[in-house]
C-alpha cells in the first residue's frame, strides 16, 4: 500500500508526524471527460508524542480534493455503498426542528410585510432621527432572519435594498441594526454568508455609501466567513499595512472570484438556487464562466500584488530552464539595456587605481544625484540605479535609495558610477562599458542549446519532451490570448471597438467580429505584437505596470522585436513609451522654481519633480484654490512617486529641519482635499514613524508631525489603524514622556490610535485570510491543471507564484539584515569585518575595554544568530570577554543581551541566538583581551536572520497538496495493476505524462531552482516511490507485479530479437518502464557541494535528475533491486531444479548467468546495485539447494574450471576458446564467495588443483584464476598451495647451492689425498704402479655401473622422513661419475595439500635406484640442517614423507614418455625383466589395486610401450614390452601417458562425509550457544570454542578420516560456513546494533553421527604432519642405449 490502512481507511503521510485522512464527501460535479468527480475533504491529522493520532479541527486544517470513481474506490472505502458505488451527498434538509408548512407560510407573509414596512419607514425618516417603530421593525426582521427555514424569504432583492439603505444611513443605530440583520442572515452556513457578502459588495459604488464603521462591519463579517475556510499562518512574515478601503476592494474581488469558482465546481441545481442572491452581471452562461473567472482572478492578483507592495521589488525573470525536459526551442530574450551616462563625470576606467576613484566619487557626489552600481554587492546587483542619500564614517559609508529594491542600502564609494542629476544624464551606450556591465552581472540570456539526451546510458531521457506544433508557434495559446484580452477589457468602448476593427482587418473578413466573441479567436503572434505596441498609450500606470510584468508581454513584447530587421521602428516606439512629455515651460530645470527646502528633493526626482513644484505653488496661498490643486492631485494619483518621495523625506536626518517642516506643511494642506485621500499614504507611513521615533527630531517638527497625523487620522480612521499596526502608541508615549506632555493633540492622537486596536487586529486577520484564500485557489487551479491536463489560463498566475516563491533561492548567510556597521576606532578598516575573508581583520586602537562594534539592523529583523570570527594566532589581540548590548537608538544602547567568555582556541564565537525582540542597534563590546592585551583583532562578523518571505508557507502548502494528489493517484493506479497485471505496461506512459506535465508547469510558472526542486522531490516521493513499493510487493502467490513482468521479459527475450514481433513491442514497453523508474539514480556519488555564486531568478538550469538524484527516496532503489533479485532467484532456481544433474550443467549455467547479466544491463543500465542484486539472486537460488545437491554443483564448477585450465594448454584457436569459456565460468563462480557452499567448492577445487599441479606442473594461469576467484575460497587453501610451491622451489635452489658446496669440499679432500699418496709411493715405482691400476679399474666399474643405471626420475610425496641413511649409498652417489639426473624436491605442507595416505611411499629403498636414494637421503640431511639453522631445533622436528605422486620424463628409444611416478617405477622394472606380473608389482609397492591399475592403463594403451597379457595362473596379468614388429609406433616425439584426472562425485562417500562434518559442526555450534543462553557469544569466541571442542573430542568416524585424509581437519572457515548456514535457517540470531554477538534462536534437527559421540574430555588425534613432495630432473643429456634392446631411462 502507498500509505497506511487503518480501519479500512487510507491515510496519506504528508510529513513527519502528519498525515491526511478522507473524512467527508462535499459535492459532486461532471468532469471534463464526462465522468463524475467528487470533492472530498481530507483531514490533516497529527501524531502525538505518544504515537497516537489526534484529530485536529476539520475546519482548521483540511485539504479539499476532487477525486474520480477509481480514486475513491482505491482510497475512500467508507464512502462506497454496499453495491460499490459512491454514496452521493444527501440533498434532504434536516428534519429536526422543522416547522409546519402552514405556520411557515404565515411567517413568510409576515416577513414580506415587515420588509415593505421597513422600506417605507426608512424613506420617511431620511435626514431625521430614526423613529422607534423603524428600529423595532428591523429588530423583528433580525429575529425572523435567525430562523433557518425562513432563509429563502430573505433572498428577496428588496432585503438587499433595505440593508444597503440602512448601511448608508448616517444614524449609528440604523447601521448597527443593519449589522445585526446581516449577522442573523449569515449565521446559518458559510454559503449563505458568502452569498450575502457577495451581493452586498457587488452593489454599485458601495464604497461611497459606507463609512468606516459600516465597512468594518462588513469586513468583520467577511473575516468571520473566511476564518475557517482557508486557515493559514504567516508567522514570521511581515505583512504590509493595507488600509480598509483597499481591503474592501480586495474583499469584493475575492468574493467575486469565489462565486465564479463555485459556479465552475457546483451543480446546476445549486447554481439556480443561488441566482436570486447574485447580481445579474454575474449570472452569465456556463460557456463564459471560465473566461469571467480568469479575468476576475487576474484582477484580484493584480490588486493583491499592489496591496502587498510586491511590485516594489519586482525582480522579473528573463529566461527559464525546465526541470524535466531540456530548454524549449524558442524563448524570449531579456529586455535590451540602455546604459545612461553623464559626460560631465569620469568613469572608473579613467583612474589608475580603485582608491583614487573612490576619493573622486566621495568628493564629487552630492545628495540627490543618480548613481549606478558597478559590481555585485550582497543584495544589490551590478547595473542597479538609485539616488544618493547621505554618507558617514560607518562601513559601508554610502547610503543609496535603490530603484530595484525600493529601499536604501549602504555600499562602498568605489562601487558607484556617478550619473549626476537627472538633467545631466544622457541615453548613450558605450560599447566597452556595456561589455563590462554585462560581464559584471546585468545578465543576458544563456545561449540556445538544442535538446539532447542525458549522457548516461539510455538513448532517450526518462521524460520525453513534447514536439511543438509549428502552427501553434505561429499563434498565441488561449492562455496567452486571454492574458492579453485582460488588458483589452480595461479599454473604454471606443478603444475596444478600435481593437475589434484591427482584428477584423487583419483576419481579412474571415469572421464577423464583435467584442463578445474575441476570447474565442485564435490570434497570430504578429497581430498580438501589433496590439502590444498600441496598448501602452491607452492604459493607466497601474495597468501599464501589469502589462510590462505579464508573461505574454515578456515573451512577445517590443523588446523581443528589437533584433528583427523587418521591424526597424519598434525600438523607437518602445522608447516613446518611457518618454515624459513636457511643455515648453518645463524645459527649464524644475529646481529653479522650487523653494530652497525642496530644491534638493526636486532635483533628485528629475522631470517628475515639477509636480512637487506645482503642488507647492498651488498650496502656497492662504486659501488654496481647488481648481489649481485638483490637477496636481490627479497627476499624483497616476504617478505617486513624487508624493511618496515627499513623505519619505521625513526619514532623512534631523538636520534637514526646513525640509521636514515644508513637507509637513504641504501634507497638512493636502489632507483637506477629498481627492488626496486616494493617494497611497499608507505606503510611506513608516517614514512618519521613523521621524517620530528619532531622538534627534526637533520639537517643532514633532509638533507639526503630531498635527498632521491627527488631522489625517481624523479624516480617515483607516490611517489610525495603520499607525496602530506600526506601533505609534508606544512611540507617542515616549515622545510625551520626553517632552513632558507639552505637545498639543499628542494625547488625543494616542487615544485615537489605541481605540483602533480591534480594527488593526481585524485588518491583519483580513489580510491573512485573503492571501491564504488566494493561495488555496491557486493550489486548486494547479490541481485542476494536473487532473484535466488543460493549461492554466489565469492572467498573472506566474506573477503571483513568483512573488510567493521569492526568497526560496535567497542566500541566508548573506549579511543582508543590517544596514551598516560602525567601529570604535580605525573606521577605514571596518569593511574587513564583512569581507568574508578570514585572513583580514579589524584592529582597534585605544585603551583596554573601550573597543566596540555597532551594528545598525534593518527594521523588523529579528537576529537568529550573531557570530564573531576570531583567531587563536592573534594571541593577546584575541578577545577574552565580550558583552552584547541592544538599544532603540545609538544613545540608548544600555540593555545587556549576553556576555560571553571566549576560549583561547575558539574560532567562531556565537554571541546571540534566536532573539524574540527587534533591536535597532546592537553593540558588541570587547571588555577584555587574552593575556591582558590592550587592542583587539576581529576577523569577521556574521549576522543571520529569518527569511521574511512567503516561500516557506507556500512550499508547505504546495508540497502537501502535491503529495496528497499524487499519492491518491498512485494508489488508484496500483489498484488497477493489482486487478490486471497487464496494465503495468501502461504505467510508463502514465508516469511520463504526469512528470512531463510537472516539468512544463515548473518551466512556465516556478521562478527558480529551489521551488522547482521542492516540487520535483515531492512528486517523486508521492508518485514514483509508492508505485514502486506497490508493484514490487508480493501478492498472494508470492509474486509481485513487476516481478511477473520481468519474468515475462526474460522468457520472451529470444523472440524479442524480431522487431516485427509482439514480443519486441512488449520488451520495449518493459524497458521504457524500468528506464523511467531508475533513470535518475546516479552511477557515481554526487560531488561535494561548493559554495559558488549562482545567477538569480530563472537563469539557472532546472535539472530534475540532480534533485531526484540527491532527494530520491532510497526505498525506490531498494524495492526495485529486491524485486529484480527475487526474479533472478526464481529463474535460477528453476534452472537448478531441472538441470543440476546434466553433464553440460556448468556451460548452460554460465550461459544463463550471462543472459541475466545482459538483461540487467538492458533493463536498468550499468548500475552496480542491480548487478549486485542479480548476483545475490543467483546466490539465493544456490542456497536453496540441499547439501548434497549443492556439493554436486560446486564439484561441477571445480571440474569445469580444471578442464578449461588443462584445455587451454593446447594453444591455438581451441586454447583461446577454452580461455574464453574459463573467463565466463569464473564470472559466474564469483557469486559463491559469501555463501556456505564456498567451503565445499574450495574442497573440490583444492583436490583438482593439487592433482593438476603435481601431474602437469604450474603455469601463469593458476595465479590469474586465483586472483579472480580468490574470494570464493574462505580458507585460502589454493592460495596457500601456490605459496608453498614457491617456497619449495626456493628450497630447491638452496639445495643446489648446498650440493655444489659439498662437491667442492670433497674435491679438495680428494686432491689432498692424491698428493699424500704420490709422496708416499715416490720411491717404490712398481708398487705404486700396481696400486694405480687397481684404482683405475674401480673407477671404471663405477662409471659402467652408472651407465647401466637409469638416469633420473621425478617423485613427489608427503609424510615422514626415514631416520636411517646408509653411508655406502651416500658415498656411491657422491663419487658417481656418470651423468646424474636432475632431481627437484618439492617440500609441501600437508595443511594445504590434500594427499591421501594411500599415495604414501612406504618403502623408498625398494623403489628407487641406489644413487637416487642417496640424493633423497642427501636432501633429507640438507632439510634437517636448514631447520636447525633457522632456529627451529627447539620445536618438534618436522619429518619428510615421500609419496608416489609426481611426474617423470622417461626416454624410450627416440621417444620421451611423460609418465607419473608410479608409471616410471613400473617401467624401470622392465629394464632387466622381459615380463613382470601385476601381482608382484602390487606386492612390491604396496599400492592399492585401483592406483596401480590407473597407472597401467595408459601404458598398455595404443600409445603406450607395454602389453598386458591375461594368464589364468597369474591374477591381474603380466606386463611386457610391446614388440614393434607387431604394431609399429612413432619413433620420435613426446608421448603423454600420465593417467587422466580422476573426478570425485558428491553423491559418493566423499560428499556424504562432507555432510557429516558439517552436521557435526552444526551440532557443536548449537550446543555451545545453548549452553551460554541469552548472554550469547562473540563470533570469534564461538569459533575458538568450536575448534577447541573439535580438537579435544574423539576424531570423527574413522571412515571419514580415511576417505578425506587430513581433509577431516576442522578450520575456522568451516565453522564460519556453518554459522552462515544456521543464520540463514534462523537457528541463530544477532542484533542489528551488535552484529558480532550470536544467540541461539530456535532448535533445529541436526544430523548427528551415530558412530562416536563428541566428548570434549577425551584425547584428540596426533598432531598433523608436514608432507613433502619430490621432483627429479636430469642434469645431463639423455642416455641412448648402444645396444639393440630398448630400455627405459628417466629423462626427467
UniProtKB/Swiss-Prot annotation:
**From what superkingdom does this record's organism come?**
Eukaryota
Location within or outside the cell: Cytoplasm; Cytoplasm, Cytoskeleton, Microtubule organizing center, Centrosome; Cytoplasm, Perinuclear region; Golgi apparatus
**Compositional bias of kind Basic and acidic residues:** 1319-1335
Q: Which residues form the DOC domain?
A: 791-970
What is the annotated role of this protein in its UniProt record? Core component of the 3M and Cul7-RING(FBXW8) complexes, which mediate the ubiquitination and subsequent proteasomal degradation of target proteins. Core component of the 3M complex, a complex required to regulate microtubule dynamics and genome integrity. It is unclear how the 3M complex regulates microtubules, it could act by controlling the level of a microtubule stabilizer. The Cul7-RING(FBXW8) complex alone lacks ubiquitination activity and does not promote polyubiquitination and proteasomal degradation of p53/TP53.
Entry protein name: Cullin-7
An example of a Gene Ontology BP annotation on this entry? epithelial to mesenchymal transition
Acidic residues bias locations:
1357-1374
Please give the GO cellular component terms listed in this UniProt entry.
3M complex; centrosome; Cul7-RING ubiquitin ligase complex; cytoplasm; Golgi apparatus; perinuclear region of cytoplasm
Q: Which organism is it from?
A: Rattus norvegicus
Pathway(s) of this molecule:
Protein modification; protein ubiquitination
Domain spans labelled CPH = 348-421
Is the Cytoplasm keyword given for this protein? yes
**Which gene underlies this protein?**
Cul7
Could you say which protein family the record assigns here? Belongs to the cullin family.
**Which Pfam family is one of those matched by this entry?**
ANAPC10
Q: How does it assemble?
A: Component of the 3M complex, composed of core components CUL7, CCDC8 and OBSL1. Component of the Cul7-RING(FBXW8) complex consisting of CUL7, RBX1, SKP1 and FBXW8. Within the Cul7-RING(FBXW8) complex interacts with FBXW8 and RBX1, but not with SKP1. Interacts with CUL1 (via the C-terminal domain); the interaction seems to be mediated by FBXW8; it is likely specific to FBXW8, but not other F-box proteins.
**Signal recorded as keyword:** no
| Glycyl lysine isopeptide (Lys-Gly) (interchain with G-Cter in NEDD8) crosslink site(s) | 1570
Segments carrying the region annotation (Disordered) are 1319-1374
Amino acid at each position: 500500500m502507498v500509505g497506511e490502512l487503518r480501519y479500512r481507511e487510507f491515510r496519506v503521510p504528508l510529513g513527519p508526524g502528519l498525515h491526511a485522512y478522507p473524512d467527508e464527501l462535499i459535492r459532486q460535479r461532471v468532469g471534463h471527460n464526462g465522468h463524475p468527480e467528487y470533492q472530498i475533504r481530507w483531514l490533516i491529522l497529527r501524531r502525538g508524542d505518544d504515537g497516537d493520532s489526534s484529530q485536529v479541527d476539520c475546519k482548521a486544517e483540511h485539504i479539499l480534493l476532487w477525486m474520480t470513481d477509481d480514486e475513491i474506490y482505491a482510497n475512500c472505502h467508507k464512502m462506497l455503498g454496499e453495491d460499490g458505488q459512491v454514496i452521493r451527498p444527501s440533498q434532504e434538509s434536516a428534519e429536526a426542528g422543522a416547522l409546519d408548512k402552514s405556520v411557515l407560510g404565515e411567517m413568510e407573509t409576515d416577513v414580506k410585510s415587515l420588509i415593505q414596512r421597513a422600506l417605507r419607514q426608512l424613506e420617511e425618516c431620511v435626514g431625521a432621527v430614526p423613529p422607534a417603530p423603524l428600529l423595532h421593525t428591523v429588530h423583528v426582521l433580525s429575529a425572523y432572519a435567525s430562523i433557518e427555514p425562513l432563509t429563502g424569504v430573505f433572498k428577496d432583492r428588496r432585503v438587499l435594498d433595505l440593508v444597503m439603505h440602512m448601511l448608508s444611513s448616517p444614524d449609528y443605530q440604523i447601521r448597527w441594526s443593519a449589522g445585526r440583520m446581516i449577522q442573523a442572515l449569515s449565521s446559518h452556513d458559510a454559503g449563505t454568508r458568502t452569498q450575502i457578502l457577495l451581493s452586498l459588495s457587488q452593489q454599485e459604488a458601495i464604497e461611497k455609501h459606507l463609512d468606516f464603521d459600516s465597512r468594518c462591519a462588513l469586513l468583520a463579517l467577511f473575516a468571520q466567513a473566511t476564518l475557517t475556510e482557508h486557515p493559514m499562518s504567516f508567522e514570521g512574515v511581515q505583512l504590509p499595512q493595507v488600509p480598509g478601503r483597499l481591503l474592501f476592494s480586495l474583499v469584493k474581488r475575492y468574493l467575486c472570484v469565489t462565486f465564479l469558482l463555485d459556479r465552475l465546481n457546483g451543480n446546476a441545481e445549486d447554481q439556480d438556487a443561488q441566482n436570486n442572491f447574485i447580481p445579474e452581471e454575474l449570472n452569465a452562461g456556463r460557456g463564459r464562466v471560465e473566461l469571467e473567472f480568469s479575468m476576475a482572478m487576474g484582477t484580484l492578483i493584480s490588486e493583491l500584488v499592489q496591496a502587498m507592495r510586491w511590485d516594489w521589488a519586482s525582480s522579473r525573470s528573463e529566461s527559464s530552464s525546465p526541470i524535466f525536459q531540456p530548454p524549449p526551442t524558442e524563448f524570449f530574450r531579456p529586455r535590451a539595456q540602455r546604459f545612461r551616462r553623464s559626460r560631465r563625470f569620469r568613469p572608473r576606467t579613467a583612474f589608475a587605481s580603485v582608491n583614487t576613484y573612490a576619493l573622486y566619487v566621495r568628493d564629487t557626489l552630492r545628495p540627490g544625484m543618480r548613481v549606478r552600481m558597478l559590481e555585485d554587492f550582497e543584495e544589490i546587483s551590478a547595473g542597479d540605479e538609485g539616488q544618493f542619500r547621505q554618507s558617514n564614517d560607518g562601513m559601508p559609508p554610502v547610503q543609496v535609495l535603490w530603484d530595484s529594491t525600493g529601499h536604501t542600502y549602504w555600499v562602498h564609494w568605489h562601487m558607484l558610477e556617478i550619473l549626476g542629476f537627472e538633467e545631466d544624464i544622457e541615453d548613450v551606450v558605450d560599447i566597452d562599458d556595456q561589455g563590462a556591465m554585462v560581464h559584471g552581472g546585468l545578465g543576458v540570456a544563456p545561449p540556445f542549446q538544442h535538446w539532447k539526451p542525458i549522457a548516461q546510458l539510455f538513448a532517450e531521457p526518462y521524460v520525453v519532451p513534447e514536439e511543438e506544433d509549428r502552427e501553434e508557434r505561429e499563434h498565441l495559446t488561449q492562455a496567452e490570448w486571454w492574458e492579453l484580452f485582460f488588458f483589452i477589457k480595461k479599454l473604454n468602448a471606443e478603444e475596444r471597438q478600435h481593437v475589434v476593427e484591427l482584428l477584423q482587418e487583419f483576419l481579412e473578413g474571415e469572421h464577423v467580429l464583435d467584442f463578445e466573441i474575441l476570447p474565442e479567436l485564435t490570434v497570430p503572434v504578429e497581430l498580438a505584437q501589433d496590439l502590444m505596441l498600441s496598448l501602452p498609450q491607452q492604459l493607466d500606470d497601474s495597468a501599464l505596470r501589469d502589462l510590462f510584468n505579464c508573461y505574454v508581454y515578456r515573451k512577445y513584447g517590443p523588446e523581443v522585436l528589437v533584433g528583427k530587421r523587418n521591424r526597424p521602428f519598434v525600438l523607437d516606439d518602445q522608447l516613446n513609451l518611457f518618454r515624459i512629455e513636457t511643455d515648453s515651460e518645463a524645459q527649464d530645470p524644475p529646481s529653479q522654481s522650487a523653494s530652497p527646502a525642496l530644491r534638493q528633493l526636486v532635483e533628485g526626482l528629475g522631470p517628475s519633480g515639477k509636480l512637487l513644484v506645482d503642488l507647492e505653488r498651488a498650496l502656497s496661498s492662504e486659501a488654496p484654490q481647488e481648481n489649481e490643486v485638483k490637477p496636481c492631485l490627479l497627476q499624483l494619483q497616476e504617478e505617486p512617486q513624487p508624493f511618496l518621495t515627499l513623505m519619505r523625506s521625513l526619514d532623512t536626518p534631523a538636520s534637514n529641519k526646513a525640509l521636514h517642516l515644508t513637507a509637513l506643511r504641504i501634507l497638512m494642506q493636502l489632507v483637506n482635499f477629498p481627492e488626496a485621500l486616494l493617494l497611497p499614504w499608507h505606503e510611506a507611513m513608516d517614514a512618519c514613524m521613523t521621524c517620530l521615533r528619532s531622538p534627534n527630531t526637533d520639537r517643532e517638527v514633532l509638533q507639526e508631525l503630531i498635527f498632521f497625523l491627527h488631522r489625517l487620522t481624523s479624516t480617515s480612521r483607516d490611517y489610525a489603524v495603520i499607525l496602530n499596526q506600526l506601533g505609534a502608541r508606544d512611540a507617542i508615549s515616549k515622545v510625551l514622556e520626553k517632552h513632558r506632555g507639552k505637545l498639543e493633540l499628542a494625547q488625543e492622537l494616542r487615544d485615537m490610535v489605541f481605540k483602533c486596536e480591534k480594527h488593526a487586529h481585524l485588518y491583519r486577520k483580513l489580510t491573512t485570510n485573503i492571501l491564504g484564500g488566494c493561495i488555496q485557489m491557486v493550489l486548486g487551479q494547479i490541481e485542476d491543471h494536473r487532473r484535466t491536463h488543460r493549461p492554466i489560463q489565469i492572467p498573472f498566475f506566474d506573477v503571483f507564484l513568483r512573488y510567493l516563491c521569492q526568497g526560496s533561492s535567497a542566500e541566508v548567510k548573506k549579511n543582508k539584515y543590517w544596514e551598516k556597521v560602525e567601529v570604535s576606532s580605525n573606521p577605514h578598516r571596518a569593511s574587513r569585518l564583512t569581507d568574508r575573508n578570514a585572513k583580514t581583520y579589524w584592529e582597534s586602537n585605544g585603551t583596554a575595554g573601550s573597543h566596540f562594534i555597532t551594528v545598525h539592523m534593518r527594521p523588523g529583523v529579528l537576529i537568529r544568530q550573531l557570530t564573531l570570527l576570531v583567531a587563536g594566532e592573534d594571541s593577546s589581540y584575541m578577545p577574552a570577554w565580550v558583552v552584547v548590548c541592544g538599544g532603540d537608538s545609538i544613545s540608548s544602547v544600555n540593555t545587556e543581551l549576553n556576555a560571553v567568555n571566549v576560549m583561547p582556541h575558539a574560532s567562531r564565537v556565537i554571541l546571540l541566538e534566536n532573539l524574540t525582540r527587534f533591536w535597532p542597534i546592537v553593540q558588541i563590546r570587547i571588555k577584555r583581551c587574552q593575556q591582558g592585551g590592550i587592542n583587539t583583532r576581529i576577523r569577521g562578523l556574521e549576522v543571520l536572520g529569518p527569511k521574511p518571505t512567503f516561500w516557506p508557507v507556500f512550499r508547505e502548502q504546495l508540497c502537501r497538496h502535491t503529495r496528497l494528489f499524487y499519492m491518491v493517484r498512485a494508489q488508484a493506479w496500483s489498484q488497477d495493476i493489482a486487478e490486471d497485471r497487464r496494465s503495468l505496461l501502461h504505467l510508463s506512459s502514465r508516469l511520463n505524462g504526469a512528470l512531463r506535465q510537472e516539468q512544463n508547469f515548473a518551466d512556465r510558472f516556478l521562478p527558480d531552482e529551489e521551488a522547482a526542486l521542492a516540487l520535483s522531490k515531492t512528486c517523486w516521493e508521492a508518485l514514483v516511490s509508492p508505485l514502486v513499493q506497490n508493484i514490487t510487493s508480493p501478492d498472494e502467490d508470492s509474486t509481485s507485479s513487476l516481478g511477473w513482468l520481468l519474468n515475462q521479459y526474460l522468457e520472451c527475450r529470444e523472440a524479442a530479437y524480431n522487431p516485427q514481433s509482439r514480443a519486441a513491442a512488449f520488451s520495449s514497453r518493459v524497458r521504457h518502464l524500468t528506464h523511467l523508474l531508475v533513470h535518475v539514480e546516479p552511477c557515481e556519488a554526487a560531488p561535494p557541494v561548493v559554495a559558488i555564486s549562482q545567477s538569480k531568478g530563472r537563469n539557472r538550469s532546472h535539472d530534475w535528475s540532480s534533485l531526484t538524484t540527491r532527494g530520491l527516496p532510497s526505498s525506490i532503489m531498494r524495492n526495485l533491486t529486491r524485486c529484480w533479485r527475487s526474479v533472478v532467484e526464481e529463474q535460477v532456481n528453476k534452472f537448478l531444479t531441472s538441470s543440476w544433474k546434466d553433464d553440460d550443467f556448468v556451460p548452460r549455467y554460465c550461459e544463463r548467468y550471462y543472459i541475466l547479466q545482459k538483461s540487467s544491463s538492458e533493463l536498468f543500465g550499468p548500475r552496480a546495485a542491480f548487478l549486485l542484486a542479480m548476483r545475490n539472486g543467483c546466490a539465493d537460488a544456490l542456497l536453496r539447494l540441499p547439501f548434497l545437491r549443492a556439493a554436486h554443483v560446486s564439484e561441477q564448477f571445480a571440474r569445469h574450471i580444471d578442464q578449461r585450465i588443462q584445455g587451454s594448454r593446447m594453444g591455438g584457436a581451441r586454447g583461446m576458446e577454452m580461455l574464453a569459456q574459463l573467463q565466463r565460468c569464473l564470472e559466474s563462480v564469483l557469486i559463491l564467495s559469501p555463501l556456505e557452499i564456498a567451503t565445499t567448492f574450495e574442497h573440490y577445487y583444492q583436490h583438482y588443483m593439487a592433482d593438476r599441479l603435481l601431474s602437469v606442473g604450474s603455469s601463469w594461469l593458476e595465479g590469474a584464476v586465483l586472483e579472480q576467484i580468490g574470494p570464493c575460497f574462505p580458507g585460502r587453501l589454493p592460495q596457500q598451495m601456490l605459496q608453498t610451491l614457491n617456497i619449495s622451489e626456493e628450497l630447491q635452489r638452496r639445495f643446489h647451492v648446498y650440493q655444489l658446496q659439498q662437491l667442492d669440499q670433497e674435491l679438495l679432500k680428494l686432491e689432498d689425498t692424491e698428493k699424500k699418496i704420490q709422496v708416499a709411493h715416490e720411491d717404490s715405482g712398481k708398487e705404486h704402479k700396481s696400486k694405480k691400476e687397481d684404482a683405475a679399474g674401480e673407477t671404471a666399474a663405477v662409471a659402467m655401473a652408472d651407465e647401466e643405471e637409469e638416469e633420473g626420475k621425478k617423485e613427489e610425496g608427503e609424510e615422514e622422513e626415514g631416520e636411517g641413511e646408509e653411508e655406502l649409498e651416500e658415498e656411491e652417489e657422491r663419487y658417481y661419475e656418470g651423468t646424474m639426473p636432475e632431481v627437484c624436491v618439492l617440500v609441501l605442507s600437508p595443511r594445504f595439500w590434500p594427499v591421501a595416505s594411500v599415495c604414501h611411499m612406504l618403502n623408498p629403498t625398494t623403489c628407487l635406484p641406489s644413487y637416487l636414494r642417496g640424493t633423497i637421503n642427501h636432501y633429507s640431511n640438507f632439510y634437517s640442517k636448514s631447520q636447525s639453522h633457522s632456529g627451529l631445533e627447539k620445536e618438534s622436528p618436522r619429518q619428510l614423507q615421500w609419496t608416489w605422486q609426481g611426474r617423470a620424463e622417461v626416454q624410450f628409444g627416440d621417444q620421451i614418455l611423460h609418465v607419473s611416478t608410479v608409471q616410471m617405477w613400473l617401467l624401470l622394472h622392465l629394464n632387466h625383466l622381459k615380463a613382470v606380473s601385476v601381482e608382484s608389482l602390487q606386492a612390491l609397492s604396496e599400492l592399492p589395486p585401483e592406483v596401480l591399475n590407473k597407472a597401467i592403463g595408459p601404458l598398455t594403451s595404443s600409445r603406450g610401450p607395454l602389453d598386458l597379457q591375461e594368464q589364468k595362473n597369474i591374477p591381474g596379468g603380466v606386463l611386457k614390452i610391446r614388440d614393434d614388429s607387431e604394431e609399429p609406433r612413432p619413433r620420435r616425439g613426446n608421448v603423454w601417458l600420465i593417467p587422466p584426472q580422476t573426478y570425485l562425485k558428491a553423491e559418493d562417500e566423499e560428499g556424504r562425509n562432507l555432510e557429516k562434518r558439517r552436521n557435526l559442526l552444526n551440532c557443536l555450534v548449537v550446543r555451545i550457544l545453548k549452553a551460554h543462553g541469552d548472554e550469547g557469544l562473540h563470533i570469534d569466541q564461538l569459533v575458538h570454542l568450536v575448534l577447541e571442542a573439535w580438537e579435544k573430542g574423539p576424531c570423527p568416524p574413522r571412515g571419514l578420516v580415511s576417505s578425506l585424509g587430513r581433509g577431516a581437519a576442522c578450520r575456522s572457515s568451516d565453522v564460519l560456513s556453518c554459522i552462515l548456514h544456521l543464520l540463514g535457517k534462523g537457528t541463530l540470531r544477532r542484533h542489528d546494533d551488535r552484529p558480532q554477538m550470536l544467540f541461539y534462536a530456535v532448535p533445529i534437527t541436526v544430523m548427528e553421527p551415530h558412530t562416536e559421540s563428541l566428548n570434549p574430555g577425551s584425547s584428540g588425534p596426533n598432531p598433523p604432519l608436514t608432507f613433502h613432495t619430490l621432483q627429479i630432473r636430469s642434469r645431463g643429456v639423455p642416455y641412448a642405449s648402444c645396444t639393440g634392446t630398448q630400455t627405459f631411462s628417466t629423462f626427467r
